[in-house]
UniProtKB/Swiss-Prot annotation:
Pathway: Quinol/quinone metabolism; 1,4-dihydroxy-2-naphthoate biosynthesis; 1,4-dihydroxy-2-naphthoate from chorismate: step 2/7; Quinol/quinone metabolism; menaquinone biosynthesis. One of its GO terms (molecular function) is thiamine pyrophosphate binding. This is 2-succinyl-5-enolpyruvyl-6-hydroxy-3-cyclohexene-1-carboxylate synthase. The gene is menD. Belongs to the TPP enzyme family. MenD subfamily.
Amino acid sequence: MADALSVYAAALVDGLAQAGVTEAVISPGSRSTPLAMAMAAHPGLRLYMNIDERSAAFFALGLAKAKQRPVALVCTSGTAAANYGPAVVEAYYSRVPLVVLTADRPHELRDVGAPQAIDQLHLYGRYAKWFVDLALPEEADDMLRYARTMAARAVQTAAGAPCGPVHVNAPFREPLVPHIDEAVWERVRSVSRAPQVWRGRPALPQESVSALYEQLSAAERGLIVCGPLDRPGFAEAVTELARALDFPILADPLSQLRAGTHDKTYVLDSYDAILREETAASKLVPDVVLRFGAMPVSKPLFLWLKRHRAIRQIVVDDGGWRDPTLSADSFVQSDEWILCRQLLEWAKPKENKSAWSAIWREMNAIARAALERHLPKEEWFEGNVFTELADLLPAGAALFVGNSMPIRDADTFLFATDKPLRVLANRGANGIDGVVSSALGASVAANPLVLVIGDLSFYHDLNGLLAAKMHSLSATIVLLNNNGGGIFSFLPQARHKGAFETLFGTPTDLSFAHAVEMYGGRHTVPHNWAEFRRHVSESLSSGGLHVIEVRTSRAENVRMHRLLWNEVAREIAKCLE
C-alpha cells in the first residue's frame, strides 16, 4: 500500500503536469526530496538540475520566458529559497510565469530554532501573484484532490494575465524518501484529474472599440509606441493597424517589431537618436500616443513623453498599471493582439496620408543613414556588435541582450530587418544579475542563441555557465569587456573624477579565459571585425558554449556614441532648416 508521502507528492507533481508544466528546474537539497523524486519519476516532465539556487531561478525564468508557459522551480528549505528572490522579482515585473515550490520544515519545527528553518510564509511578498502554505501529506482521497487542485491553481494563476510567479510552500516531515511506482500513479489518477481551466484573453465590448477608434482616427498627429512585448501575431496586427491609422510606430528592440517578415513601412528604429535633437523633438510632438507593452528602454523617449503632458497617452495592457511617466490619459485593459484586430474591423483606408507620418519616417531614414554612415569600420565600437550580429545570425535565431549598455546599444544600433529574429532581455527589474543563467535557460527553447553582455554582468553570473556544461547547451556569448561599468561614463557621476573609478567605474582587471574553460566552454578574443565574424560563424555552426570576448575602451565608447549622436543631430537639423 502506498504511503501518504509518496501519493501526496505524486498528486502534487501530477497536478502540475496535468495543468501544463513540462519542465522543472531543481536545486539539490534534502527537504525537497519528495518533490524532486516524484518529478524524476514523472514521464511528462523534463528536469534540469542546477546547483546554485540563484542561477537555477534565473535559468527557469529564461526557460519560461522563451517557452511562454509556466516552468516549475524546486528547492529545499532555508536560504535556498531566499536565493530565488532576485529571479522572482524579475519574473514579477517582466511577467514571466514561474511556479516556485519551496520545501519547508513541518509546522512544529518552525520558529523554534530548528536547523535550516526560516520563515518561508509569504517569503517573496507582493512579488508572488499567489501563495499557499500546503497541508502536510495525507493519503486520504480528499487530500490528494487538494494537492492536485493546488497544483493546478498555481499553474493557472502563473499563466493568467498578467503572467507572473506563484509560490507554493510545501512542508514535509521525515522520513523524506518517497517510494513512487506505477501503483502510486494509478492511485493518484484514480482519485481525480487536475481541474481543467479554460482561459481566455480580455477583449473590449464593441461600443468601446468604436469609441476608441473614433478617437484615434480623429487625431491628426498620432503615434504608436511599442515597448517590450512578445505576443504571437502582434507584429502583423499592429503594423496593419499602423497603416490603417497612418501612425508611425516607435518600436523598442524587445517589441519583436524590428525583425521579421511583417510590413515595416511604419516601423521606426532610430527614434532614440532623433529625440536627442531638441528642435526635432519639439516639432514631432503628437496629439495622441497608443502605447503597447512595457515602457521602452529609450530615456530620450521617456523624458519626451513625460515632458509633453498634453499628449493624450492611451496605454494598452492586459493587466497591471504601467505608466512610469504618470501621463496616461486612458488605460485599455485588453489583450494587445485582440485589440488591434478589433480596431481593424472599424478601420477605413485613409484617402490622404498625412505629412506628419511622412516627416517621422523621413527623420528615421535620415537618422539611421547617419548612424550607419558614421559607424567606425575598423576600430572596436560596442554598437557595431549589433549591426554585425544582425547580418551573422540565421533566420529564427534568438538574441538575448544584457542590461546596462548592451540593451541601450541594441536600441540604437539593432536596425529593422526582414530576417526573423527574436530579441529577449530581463527588462522587468533591469538588473545585471542572472543574465547568463537566463540566457542559457532561454537557449533550451530558442536556439541558436547569442547573448550580448557586459563584463560586470558576466562576472555577476559566472556560476550560470555550469548549466551549459551540465545540460549540454549551445550558446554564443559576446562578452563586451570595457573593464568596468561602462554606462556610468555617460552619467553625471563621470564628472567627479576623484572617486569615479572607485565608486562607479569599478575596474576588475579580470581574465575570463580560465573561468570559461573551467565550465567546459571555449574562449576567444578577436582582434578585428573579420576575426569577430569568423568566431561567431564558427560558434553558431559548431554548437557548444563559446565566449567571444571583445575588449573595448570605456572612454572611446563614450566619445564614439557622442560623435554619432551629434552627426544625427546635424543631419536632422539640416533637414529641418
